[in-house]
Amino acid sequence: MSYSSFVFDNNDGVATIRLNDPERLNALTFQTYADLEKITAEMAHDATVKVVVLTGTGKGFCSGGRVDDIIGPLLKMKGDELYKFTRMTCNAVKNMRNLKKLIIAAVNGISAGAGARLMLS
């Protein structure tokens, strides 16, 4: 499995999702949410995954939503687009909460906004 917004590996049943934008303290983008929604749905049916570790690359876990990629565009979206975005983000969190596997947030440094929400999921 390959994702553009994070590094994923599964070694001996320990699946690691490492947010991978250290220059921006692993800020979340639309692609990050889409990737998280996809990987969490896939892991639910992957018997080789026993434990999930969610962490960040560099000195920060996750600084929240990337302003130029999410916040600005969200302010310009129409209702149907906002609904799709909200469903995607809710599905990612819901998938994590419903996953029948232990999830460990290995928090390294800052965790703010939506990053704190991920940490608590």
How would you label these PLM feature ranges?
Residues N20, G65, N108:
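Histidine-centered beta-alpha loop that forms part of the nucleotide-sugar donor binding/catalytic region
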